């Protein structure tokens, strides 16, 4: 029979466990330490990425804090023209790669972006999200983090990379454009799980109404190897998605099913902010 003291202790411990899990700030996943890199590992987290991937210590890294008071407004910067973003992706795979949920189209449609004569072809879409509604995005805008940041990754003929970033904020209303993704997340709970999308995905439905309004700077990949020379276009418009849709993402795990995965929720998968150094953030308003 438990004594009053032991009962009080158990209740206190339960409250503490609930507090830390609810806040999402503490992720205790031993399997993370077995990976080449992770977001929450004790020895291979973001602060240590540069030990293995030297470019992660570079001077032009991403993500950054975008401060609108310090951007340079350039009326001559070209519009971001998108082609075939309105054409449904009828065939695509989605994979839990242990770091994100990533979607790769498998149809023959070339979806492209063009800015100032440079054309980049869409390759994949992935996401960074948080354990709470006020964190998750990699970039910040005037100090604010959003619940999720979508990255539309493109390459050109020279294999240069351009990424379009879109902020999503938590809402009571679900995003219809996100539903083809959410409906299959339960099929990829663990790392290396993959499946095909069951419904058509329209990229345009994941974009704000005026994608030509954006912030642009030169940066890097936000994951190892942190390769620099990436052209970033962070769209100004903020999209909405349902809290329940975010909850489905938070139910993914960062490790495989054969590991001790209980503490390995795939969440808060965003890299800390990197110094801007001498770079300039260009702001457009078209």
Locate predicted features.
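Alpha-carbonic anhydrase
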Residues: 2-286
């Amino acid at each position: 029979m438990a004594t009053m003291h032991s009962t009080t202790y158990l209740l206190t411990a339960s409250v503490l466990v609930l507090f830390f899990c609810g806040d999402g700030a503490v992720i205790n996943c031993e399997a993370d330490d077995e990976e080449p890199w992770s977001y929450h590992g004790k020895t291979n987290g973001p602060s240590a990425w540069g030990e293995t991937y030297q470019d992660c210590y570079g001077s032009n890294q991403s993500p950054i804090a975008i401060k609108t008071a310090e951007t340079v407004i350039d009326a001559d910067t070209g519009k971001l023209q998108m082609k075939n973003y309105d054409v449904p992706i009828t065939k695509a795979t989605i994979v839990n790669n242990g770091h994100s949920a990533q979607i790769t189209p498998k149809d023959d449609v070339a979806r492209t972006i063009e800015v100032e004569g440079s054309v980049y072809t869409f390759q994949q879409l992935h996401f960074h999200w948080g354990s709470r509604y006020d964190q998750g995005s990699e970039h910040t805008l005037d100090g604010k983090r959003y619940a999720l940041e979508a990255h539309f990754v493109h390459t050109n003929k020279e294999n240069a990379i351009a990424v379009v970033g879109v902020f999503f904020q938590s809402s009571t209303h679900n995003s219809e454009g996100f539903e083809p993704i959410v409906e299959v997340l339960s099929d990829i709970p663990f790392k290396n799980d993959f499946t095909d999308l069951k419904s058509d995905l329209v990229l345009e439905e994941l974009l704000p109404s005026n994608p030509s309004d954006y912030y642009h700077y030169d940066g890097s990949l936000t994951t190892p190897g942190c390769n620099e020379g990436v052209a970033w276009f962070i769209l100004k418009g903020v999209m909405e998605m349902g809290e329940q849709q975010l909850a489905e993402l938070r139910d993914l795990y960062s490790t495989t099913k054969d590991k001790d995965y209980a503490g390995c929720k795939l969440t808060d998968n965003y890299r800390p902010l990197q110094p801007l150094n001498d770079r300039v953030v260009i702001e457009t308003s078209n």
